[in-house]
Regions:
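Short helix-capping segments at alpha-helix termini
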Residues: 84-86, 105-106, 170-173, 205-206
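Active-site-adjacent loop and "lid" segments of alpha/beta metabolic enzymes
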Residues: 2-4, 17, 25-38, 60-78, ...
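Acidic (Asp/Glu)-rich catalytic clusters
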Residues: 46-47, 103-104, 122-132, 172
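Glycine/small-residue-rich loop that forms an oxyanion/phosphate-binding "nest" at active or ligand-binding sites
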Residues: 87-94, 100-103, 111-114
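Conserved, mostly hydrophobic/aromatic
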Residues: 19, 45, 49, 53, ...
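Hydrophobic/aromatic residues located in beta-strands of well-ordered beta-sheets
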Residues: 15, 89, 132, 178-180, ...
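Phosphate/pyrophosphate-binding loops at sites that engage ATP/ADP/AMP, CoA/4′-phosphopantetheine
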Residues: 46, 50, 87, 162-177
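The catalytic core of metal-dependent phosphodiesterases that act on cyclic dinucleotides
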Residues: 182-184
Length: 247
C-alpha cells in the first residue's frame, strides 16, 4: 500500500486537476463524449506538470439532478477507454458501485464528497487500501448542501474531521490512507467557507490537507487574486489544491 507521503513527494505542482464528465457540473465544463476537449485537458495537465487528476462523473452542485449508477458508470468507462495518459487518478463519487469500478481500473484515490457516510465506501477503502480524501460534513447534516450553523467554523470543522478520522480508523482504514478536505462550499454559507480558507493553516495537523475553491462563489468574499489564493494555500501547508483544468 502506497501512502500519501510517498506519492506527494513525487509532485511539485501542488494541484489536483479536475475533469468533469457530467453534463451539469458546477461550472458547465463537462467533457463527456467530447474526445477533443478531454484530450486537450489531459495535455494541458501534462504540460503543466500536474500529476494528480480528479475524475467526476456526476454533478455535486446545489440542486443537481441525480444520475443513475448506469449513467455514471457509462461516463467513467468513456474516460477509461479514451485516456492514454499516465496520471495518478482520483475518483470523485459517493456511489460505492462506481468507486469499486474505478478501483478495479487502476484509480488510486477515492474522493467521497459525502464524507464517507456510506459503510460500503469505508469497506472499499479498507479492502483496496487506496488513499482516500475525507471531506468534511457536519454530523447533523441530512444532505450535501444543507446549510449548517456554526459558532466557530474553523474549530468545529476541525473537531468533526478528527471525530470522523477516529471512526473510520476504528473500522479498519489506516492513518496513512487518509487526507482531509474541509469541504468548502458544501453545507456552509459563503462567509463560513471564506473564513475556513483564510484560516486553512489551522486545519493542518497530521494528515495531508486538500482544498477546493476553484470557481466557487465564496471566493468573491476574499480580497485575493487566484494566484494569491493558491500561494496562500501552499504557504499554509496545503498538499493539493483542486483546480479546474483549462486547455
Amino acid at each position: 500500500m502506497s501512502n500519501w507521503n510517498s506519492i506527494l513527494s513525487r509532485d511539485n505542482s501542488k494541484i489536483l486537476g479536475i475533469i468533469n464528465l457530467s453534463n451539469d457540473s458546477f461550472t458547465g465544463d463537462g467533457v463527456f463524449n467530447h474526445d477533443e476537449g478531454l484530450k486537450k485537458l489531459l495535455q494541458s495537465a501534462k504540460q503543466n506538470d500536474i500529476n494528480f487528476i480528479d475524475i467526476g462523473c456526476a454533478s455535486s452542485k446545489p440542486g443537481f439532478d441525480s444520475v443513475t449508477t448506469e449513467e455514471e458508470i457509462e461516463r467513467l468507462n468513456y474516460f477509461i477507454n479514451s485516456n492514454q495518459e499516465t496520471f495518478t487518478f482520483s475518483i470523485d463519487s459517493f456511489n460505492p458501485i462506481v468507486v469499486q469500478h474505478a478501483v478495479e481500473n487502476n484509480f488510486e484515490i477515492i474522493n467521497d464528497v459525502s464524507g464517507f457516510l456510506n459503510e460500503e465506501m469505508i469497506q472499499i477503502a479498507v479492502d483496496s487500501k487506496l488513499k482516500i480524501i475525507l471531506v468534511h460534513r457536519h454530523p447533523k447534516s441530512e444532505s450535501l448542501h444543507q446549510k449548517m450553523i456554526y459558532k466557530d467554523v474553523v474549530k468545529e470543522v476541525k473537531e468533526h474531521l478528527n471525530s470522523k478520522i477516529k471512526s473510520i480508523i476504528s473500522l479498519g482504514v489506516k492513518e496513512e490512507q487518509i487526507a482531509i478536505d474541509p469541504g468548502l462550499g458544501f453545507g456552509k454559507n459563503l462567509s463560513d467557507s471564506a473564513e475556513l480558507l483564510i484560516n486553512i493553516k489551522e486545519l493542518k495537523e497530521n494528515f495531508p490537507l486538500i482544498v477546493g475553491y476553484s470557481k466557487k462563489e465564496f471566493i468573491k468574499n476574499i480580497p485575493m487574486s487566484n494566484s494569491d489564493l493558491f500561494k496562500h494555500c501552499v504557504d499554509s501547508g496545503v498538499s493539493l489544491v483542486r483546480m479546474h483544468l483549462t486547455n
